A protein has these predicted regions:
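Aspartyl protease catalytic domain
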Residues: 24-61, 150-263, 344-356
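Short, solvent-exposed loop/turn and secondary-structure capping segments
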Residues: 82, 92-96, 101-104, 174-177, ...
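Aspartic protease catalytic domain
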Residues: 22-35, 168, 318-389
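Short hydrophobic beta-strand that contains or immediately precedes a catalytic carboxylate
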Residues: 70-72, 79-84, 90-92, 181-182, ...
Length: 389
């Protein structure tokens, strides 16, 4: 699955005749418990220290996505990417892309002495039934060419990293203030896998603040303990969750109440690239029933709901998502009422879209939860940690 945030609420699921998987380089295997026998000190790899990179907020009336700089090539060219826990590969606009990518900074592979053209072409099409700007047909489609080059993040360098150059894209991508996407899935790949092999601890942390607060950041290989008070609560990924960041939740609460529909156990995906939250239709309806009868589906854009903008800001809409910590203790991640309003619909600006989208088949949360916590994404221990901020 390739899933990230577009505009106000899309979770993009890749469907493609010629899928990215076909073109993808074989992921590097990371041996997480590799050091069993003692190794002579002289052979011990030198640990890499964690690095922190600042993130900017793609804000369109609401916080959408957070992106930062990496460098690619020799000499290095700066490429801005969304660090997306909902996907796993690196792709960015290149000079092979013509006018379609003119709003993005383009990487010029001819200026990099370390660039290797692998030359496999593929395309990836994104589809979902929901969104303020709904996906229709193939209106979110990237054309890609596989390659390898040096990639650096915060000064840590990974040679010969698999990546994809965007050679064409549909117009919907034109508004992005960044050039690409760096997947940060629960199985380390690309630059992150290389850095782990070089001795970097196999975790990263996100501090995704609202635009008004600023100073958002990602720490690769560590935890920035200056960004929260109190302690981190860790929960384990379910066995077999593969590369998806997912936690089991036994129950949802809205405004302190629960119902039989909300008491169901479900696995919830954590996608830093998506800002709205997605639940199956019956769950979304049960949640809205505890907020206001005036919130109704916005039929022009399937999966979305809305209410008159002048009613929305006074509605209590506290969502508690229950989880179980590694020690067996229950804890909640809480979305405050202030997240309910994600802004006016384009086709009717008097109606404001509400946070929860109906999406049958999965449950997914993103930025609207993550910006209220410091989050730790522990690949090596297959767990996630949260501390309130
Ligand atoms: C990314 O680098 C550009 C300069 O190339 C700089 O203007 C911008 O502020 C940087 N963005 C972040 C989030 O650090
Ligand atoms: C990466 O490549 C550079 C230049 O070829 C080399 O100096 C460096 O040692 C390489 N780094 C690693 C970790 O292999
Ligand atoms: C770069 O990676 C490719 C694919 O993994 C490998 O075949 C090639 O030998 C590597 N090149 C160098 C210089 O390490
Ligand atoms: C890029 O894609 C658009 C469709 O989105 C298509 O019309 C156009 O011909 C493509 N350009 C190239 C150079 O392939
Ligand atoms: C931690 O608590 C202190 C004292 O209340 C406060 O001044 C500080 O801003 C807090 N730091 C964070 C990162 O929340
Ligand atoms: C989670 O939230 C619900 C609803 O507000 C509350 O009843 C429950 O006590 C909370 N659980 C924890 C562990 O705080």
């Amino acid at each position: 699955m390739f899933c990230f945030k577009r505009l106000l609420s899309l979770c993009l699921l890749a469907v493609s005749a010629q899928t990215l998987v076909d073109a993808q380089a074989v992921p590097q295997t990371i041996h997480l418990q590799s050091r069993v026998a003692p190794v002579p000190a002289t052979l011990r790899r030198r640990a890499l220290n964690p690095v922190t990179v600042p993130l900017a907020d793609f804000f369109l009336g609401t916080d959408l996505q957070w992106f930062g700089n990496i460098s690619v090539g020799t000499p290095p060219q700066t490429v801005s990417v969304v660090f997306d826990t909902g996907s796993s590969t690196l792709e960015f606009a290149s000079t092979l892309c013509g006018a379609a990518c003119d709003n993005q900074v383009k990487f010029d592979s001819t200026k990099s002495s370390t660039f290797v053209d692998v030359g496999t072409t593929s395309s990836i099409t994104f589809s979902t039934g929901v969104g303020v700007d709904p996906v229709v047909g193939a209106n979110y489609r990237l054309t890609l060419r596989s390659a390898r080059d040096t990639v650096s993040v915060g000064g840590l360098t990974a040679n010969n990293t698999s990546l994809f150059l965007i050679t064409n894209q549909t117009a919907k991508f034109g508004i992005d203030p960044f050039s690409g996407i760096q997947g940060m899935s629960a199985r380390a790949q690309g630059f992150f896998a290389s850095l782990i092999n070089q001795g970097l601890p196999s975790l990263f942390s996100l501090f995704l603040t609202p635009q008004a607060v600023g100073h958002a950041e990602m720490t690769v290989g560590g935890i920035d303990t200056t960004k929260f008070n109190g302690s981190l609560t860790f929960a384990s990924l379910p066995a077999g969750s593969s590369s998806t960041w997912v936690l089991n939740s036994p129950q949802l609460f809205v405004n302190g109440k629960s119902t039989s529909v909300l008491k169901a156990s479900r696995n919830i995906i954590f996608d830093s690239g998506t800002s709205n939250i997605l639940f199956p239709t019956a769950t979304a309806n049960a949640m809205y029933a505890l907020i206001s009868p005036d919130i109704v589906p916005h039929t022009a854009e399937p999966g979305t709901y809305g209410i008159a903008c002048d009613l929305i800001d006074t509605l209590p809409a506290v969502i508690d998502i229950a989880f179980t910590s590694q020690s067996g203790a229950p804890f909640n991640l809480t979305i405050p009422s202030s997240e309910l309003n994600v802004g006016p619909f384009a086709d009717n600006p008097a109606i404001c879209q509400t946070l929860i989208n109906a999406f049958d088949g999965l449950s997914l949360v993103g930025g609207s939860v993550l910006k209220h916590y410091y989050s730790v994404w522990d690949v090596g221990n297959q767990r996630m940690g949260f501390a309130a901020i």
